[in-house]
């Protein structure tokens, strides 16, 4: 039986040369749109990074849109995406649809200044870095030091892209911290709420 999360819509394009079927993500990629719509792990990061690099190669002067609806995930995978976003030549516009939580919030705020958006009913969420460890006490201590190191990296990224002080970022991310789209604008995580233009 096919599960709904494995169904990818197909789009038929007609031209003088006939019809051609594209999966929806390939069609979006042709329009320089990447969709991050799942938990962040190494496989998802590899796909997003490959798309970013491809679009950089295709046209280094044309913006890329990264739509985000993600609960976050693995920090190292998220940082790989973050570093690639900062490395490539095109400006990456980020758009939160639904929810951007944890690592996804870091990616959302890391978009090009002035091009970070959320839809009106989006939720943005921050918290401390999380992880787990087991084994000998010395192994657990090593793992704890590493997660604290990663947490410092994430906090510095948030400071850089929001303009907030380190003290405020530390305080606000100490526990679950939820923001509406408007609150995210005021916080500096995004620049604008996207609205449908009113008909005149």
UniProtKB/Swiss-Prot annotation:
Active-site residues annotated for this sequence: 102, 127
One of the GO biological process terms: protein quality control for misfolded or incompletely synthesized proteins
InterPro entries found in the cross-reference section: ClpP, ClpP/crotonase-like_dom_sf, ClpP/TepA, ClpP_Ser_AS
Originating organism: Dehalococcoides mccartyi (strain ATCC BAA-2100 / JCM 16839 / KCTC 5957 / BAV1)
PROSITE patterns: CLP_PROTEASE_SER
Function: Cleaves peptides in various proteins in a process that requires ATP hydrolysis. Has a chymotrypsin-like activity. Plays a major role in the degradation of misfolded proteins.
Protein name per the record: ATP-dependent Clp protease proteolytic subunit
Enzyme class label: hydrolase
Assembly description: Fourteen ClpP subunits assemble into 2 heptameric rings which stack back to back to give a disk-like structure with a central cavity, resembling the structure of eukaryotic proteasomes.
Alphabetical keyword list: Cytoplasm, Hydrolase, Protease, Serine protease
């Amino acid at each position: 039986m096919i599960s709904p999360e494995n169904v990818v819509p197909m789009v038929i394009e007609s031209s003088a040369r006939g019809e051609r079927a594209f999966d929806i993500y390939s069609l979006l990629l042709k329009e320089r749109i990447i969709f991050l719509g799942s938990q962040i792990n190494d496989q998802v990061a590899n796909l997003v990074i490959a798309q970013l690099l491809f679009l950089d190669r295709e046209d280094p002067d044309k913006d890329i849109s990264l739509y985000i609806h993600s609960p976050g995930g693995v920090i190292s995978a998220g940082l790989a995406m973050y570093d690639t976003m900062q490395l490539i030549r095109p400006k990456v516009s980020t758009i939160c649809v639904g929810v951007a939580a944890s690592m996804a919030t870091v990616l959302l705020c890391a978009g090009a200044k002035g091009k970070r958006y959320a839809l009106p009913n989006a939720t943005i969420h921050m918290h401390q870095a999380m992880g787990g460890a087991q084994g000998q006490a010395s192994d657990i201590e090593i793992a704890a030091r590493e997660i604290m190191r990663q947490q410092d990296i994430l906090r510095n990224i948030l400071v850089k892209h929001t303009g907030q002080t380190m003290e405020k970022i530390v305080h606000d991310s100490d526990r679950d911290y939820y923001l509406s789209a408007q609150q995210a604008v005021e916080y500096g995580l995004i620049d604008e709420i996207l609205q449908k233009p009113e008909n005149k």
